[in-house]
């Protein structure tokens, strides 16, 4: 009887375990090392107990490793809940839920703050994080489209998206968190997001459309 399928599955499992170990070591480096500038394939390989070539084969580059670590931080931080929020029938409730998800995420992992601080000095970190943040902008844009209806002006929609994108950022969370609890920050950001919708809803009403109002989908 051939042992090839068994051997293949063992190798696959071993490779997956090694990959997980590298990601864990990389995430630990981002959380604990004195300087994020020391983050490299060599340093992570040493911490994970593997060769640099192994890390290179698994991730291809420092950027590839960063993306894998970001994916894991996002998974552990609850960003997978965004899909459920976007499936909510009431876009206002979905926006509130989005704020809750990001407040919890920004608060959970010290690596998140350190990564944003590193954007000023490490172009590769900056490029990776800008791409991640643009996903949040895209999500906000979808919700604004649902809330505004079809006739709100492009300017009003853009202003609402930009404001809410800024309000849900790590920089905003960190500034507000200095002397507030996470729940207080979350409530304040929600209120500010509701305020950011005001001009958008007024613009849509003047245009003759019927923008989605809070709780409209639950009206009987």
Q: Which residues are covered by each model-predicted region?
A:
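Helix-turn-helix
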Residues: 21, 29-64, 68
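N-terminal intrinsically disordered/low-complexity leader segments
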Residues: 1-17, 204-220
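Hydrophobic alpha-helical connector segments
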Residues: 68, 81-108
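N-terminal positioning helix adjacent to the helix-turn-helix/winged-helix DNA-binding module
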Residues: 11, 18-25, 156
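Amphipathic C-terminal alpha-helical segment
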Residues: 142, 162-181, 195-203
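Short, basic, alpha-helical segments at the C-terminal edge of helix-turn-helix-like DNA-binding modules
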Residues: 41, 70-78
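Amphipathic alpha-helical packing segments from all-alpha helical-bundle domains
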Residues: 100-115, 124-150, 158-162, 187-198
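Alpha-helical DNA-contacting segments of helix-turn-helix folds
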Residues: 64-73, 113, 132
């Amino acid at each position: 009887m051939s042992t090839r399928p068994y051997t293949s599955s063992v190798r696959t499992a071993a490779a997956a375990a090694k990959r997980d170990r590298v990601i864990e070591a990389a995430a630990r480096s981002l959380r604990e090392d004195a300087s994020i500038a020391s983050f490299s394939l060599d340093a992570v390989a040493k911490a994970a107990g593997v060769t640099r070539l192994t890390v290179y084969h698994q991730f291809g580059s420092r950027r590839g490793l960063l993306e894998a670590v970001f994916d894991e931080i996002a998974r552990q931080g609850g960003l997978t809940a965004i899909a459920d929020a976007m499936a909510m029938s009431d876009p206002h409730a979905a926006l509130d839920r989005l704020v809750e998800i990001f407040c919890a995420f920004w608060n959970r992992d010290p690596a998140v703050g350190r990564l944003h601080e590193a954007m000023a000095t490490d172009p590769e970190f900056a490029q990776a994080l800008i791409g991640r943040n643009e996903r949040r902008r895209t999500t906000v844009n979808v919700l604004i489209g649902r809330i505004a209806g079809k006739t709100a002006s492009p300017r009003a929609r853009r202003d609402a998206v930009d404001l809410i994108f800024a309000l849900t950022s790590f920089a905003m969370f960190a500034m507000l968190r200095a002397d507030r609890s996470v729940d207080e920050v979350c409530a304040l950001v929600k209120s500010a997001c509701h305020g950011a919708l005001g001009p958008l809803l007024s613009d849509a009403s003047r245009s003759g459309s019927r923008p989605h109002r809070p709780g409209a989908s639950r009206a009987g």
